[in-house]
């Protein structure tokens, strides 16, 4: 193994000089710097650029505090590798595969896998048309998820992306019963901590591996932590032949970290200050998240939308890789409708009669039509009032409002905030409920009875309590 010396440290960027008679490390190789002679404390660097004359520029995966010029840097000869296999379940890791959950550390001889890999070849890929039931009405009805598909949860700050992803973990991980991998990329440590203890209490943690590179970590760690989580998921798919659920919160932070790294490496920025390699980096990550003939990875990714602007290059680049999108809308949070999923902006390639069935498709398209017509009439209502509408339009508006409220429901993970029990609604019940609302069966019940309930039977019960 070749070794060099540190010649410059600029924040998370470390320049290392190797003598010209040695071979230089390959790009993406892991290099190690020991902070003291006992070799107890080390910093891992990743090769990013060759500057010429034997000098390479690296990105640190940890804080560079304590590094000095002249320190020895050892090339490991391979990329960062992380533990994989059944022993990772129930544990929490950082970007380097070190355990951070106060449990015992992994043995040195544990099976490990490199985080940089090629995506599966075209002939290995497999597609599925099986629906993944989430128990969340608005998703199951209007933008259903496919097993082995890729889903994006889009939304600005504070509209409920993380709560929605936690409810999906609660519902799918418990119902699905398979293996899950949760990757926290550049988000709040507090949320990760809450999620860990919640999963521990529910017992889901025994079938889940968790990987965190939170917002206080260097950009190198935030940029690579998604690959660490994906590597663990790929092993379960390819070697164990499992169907894996991969949750990533938040893909935007992966892009943001890449932007920071790109600037530190001296690359010319592209549109809106993003890295010129944005599409390439996103493609390298997303193309590995796929289903093969051996097993599947169903991924659910939260994607922050800066300033609620969907044309921003970061969410727009991620958009192209997804099978289904769940768009969260701030206007709905202002109306107190949770989850604040926009039923007209959200979409799914699975909403087709040959996949979901004729009745489901018919009810879903009718719901979209009613909501679209209601949106068009809102300007008239705001200016001239309800009296200017025809009798037919008044009935449509009345049903549209009931549909809109019925798309909301209480979450199990939000029970501590709302004081109301969460609900899991099977797809058949969801379709039945909306069909009966559209038929006018519940026109005599108050709109308020439809808000934040599960099944249609719960609406009737709530109406009785309200005195109807």
Swiss-Prot record:
Protein name: ATP synthase subunit beta
EC number(s) per entry: 7.1.2.2
Keywords, alphabetical: ATP synthesis, ATP-binding, Cell membrane, CF(1), Hydrogen ion transport, Ion transport, Membrane, Nucleotide-binding, Translocase, Transport
Gene3D superfamilies assigned: 2.40.10.170, Bovine Mitochondrial F1-atpase, Atp Synthase Beta Chain, Chain D, domain 3 (1.10.1140.10), P-loop containing nucleotide triphosphate hydrolases (3.40.50.300)
Family that this chain belongs to: Belongs to the ATPase alpha/beta chains family.
The organism of origin for this protein: Enterococcus hirae (strain ATCC 9790 / DSM 20160 / JCM 8729 / LMG 6399 / NBRC 3181 / NCIMB 6459 / NCDO 1258 / NCTC 12367 / WDCM 00089 / R)
Pfam family, any one: ATP-synt_VA_C
PANTHER family, per the entry: ATP SYNTHASE, ATP SYNTHASE SUBUNIT BETA, MITOCHONDRIAL
Cellular component per GO, a single term: proton-transporting ATP synthase complex
Coarse class of the protein's main subcellular location: membrane
Binding sites annotated in the UniProt record for ATP: 155-162
Location(s), subcellular: Cell membrane
Subunit structure: F-type ATPases have 2 components, CF(1) - the catalytic core - and CF(0) - the membrane proton channel. CF(1) has five subunits: alpha(3), beta(3), gamma(1), delta(1), epsilon(1). CF(0) has three main subunits: a(1), b(2) and c(9-12). The alpha and beta chains form an alternating ring which encloses part of the gamma chain. CF(1) is attached to CF(0) by a central stalk formed by the gamma and epsilon chains, while a peripheral stalk is formed by the delta and b chains.
């Amino acid at each position: 193994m070749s070794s060099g010396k540190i010649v410059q440290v600029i924040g998370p960027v470390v320049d290392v000089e190797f003598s010209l008679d040695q071979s230089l490390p390959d790009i993406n190789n892991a290099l190690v710097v020991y902070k003291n002679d006992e070799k107890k404390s080390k910093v891992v660097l990743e090769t990013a650029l060759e500057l010429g004359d034997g000098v390479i520029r690296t990105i640190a995966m940890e804080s560079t505090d304590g590094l000095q010029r002249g320190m020895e840097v050892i090339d490991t000869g391979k990329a960062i590798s992380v533990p994989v296999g059944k022993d990772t379940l129930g544990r929490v890791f950082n970007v380097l595969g070190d355990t951070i959950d106060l449990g015992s550390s992994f043995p040195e001889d544990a099976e490990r896998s490199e985080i940089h890999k090629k995506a599966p070849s075209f002939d290995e890929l497999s597609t599925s048309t099986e629906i993944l039931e989430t128990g969340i009405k608005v998703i199951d009805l209007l933008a259903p998820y496919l097993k082995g598909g890729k889903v994006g949860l889009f939304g600005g700050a504070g509209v409920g992306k993380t709560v929605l992803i936690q409810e999906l973990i609660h519902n799918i991980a418990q119902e699905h019963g398979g293996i899950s991998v949760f990757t926290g990329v550049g988000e709040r440590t507090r949320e990760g901590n809450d999620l860990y203890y919640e999963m521990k209490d529910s017992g889901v943690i025994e079938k889940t591996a968790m990987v965190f590179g939170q917002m206080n970590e260097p950009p190198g760690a935030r940029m690579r932590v998604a690959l660490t989580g994906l590597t663990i998921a790929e092993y379960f798919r390819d070697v164990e032949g499992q169907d894996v659920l991969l949750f990533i919160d938040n893909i935007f932070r992966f892009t943001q970290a890449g932007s920071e790294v790109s600037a530190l490496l001296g690359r010319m920025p592209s549109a809106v200050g993003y890295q010129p390699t944005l599409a390439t980096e996103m493609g390298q990550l997303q193309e590995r998240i796929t289903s093969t003939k051996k097993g599947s990875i169903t991924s659910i990714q939260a994607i922050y939308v800066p300033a609620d602007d969907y044309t921003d290059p970061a969410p727009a680049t991620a958009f192209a890789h997804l099978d289904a999108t769940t768009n969260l809308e701030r206007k709905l949070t202002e109306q107190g409708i949770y989850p604040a999923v926009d039923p007209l902006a959200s979409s799914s390639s699975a909403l087709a009669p040959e996949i979901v069935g004729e009745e489901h498709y018919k009810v879903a398209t009718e719901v979209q039509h009613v909501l679209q017509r209601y949106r068009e009439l809102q300007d008239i209502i705001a200016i001239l009032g309800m009296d200017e509408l025809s009798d037919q339009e008044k009935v449509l508006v009345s049903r549209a409002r009931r549909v809109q409220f019925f798309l909301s429901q209480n979450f199990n993970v939000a029970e501590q905030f709302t004081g109301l029990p969460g609900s899991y609604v099977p797809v058949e019940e969801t379709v039945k409920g909306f069909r009966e609302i559209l038929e006018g069966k519940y026109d005599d019940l108050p709109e308020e009875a439809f808000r934040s309930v599960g099944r249609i039977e719960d609406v009737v019960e709530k109406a009785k309590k309200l005195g109807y």
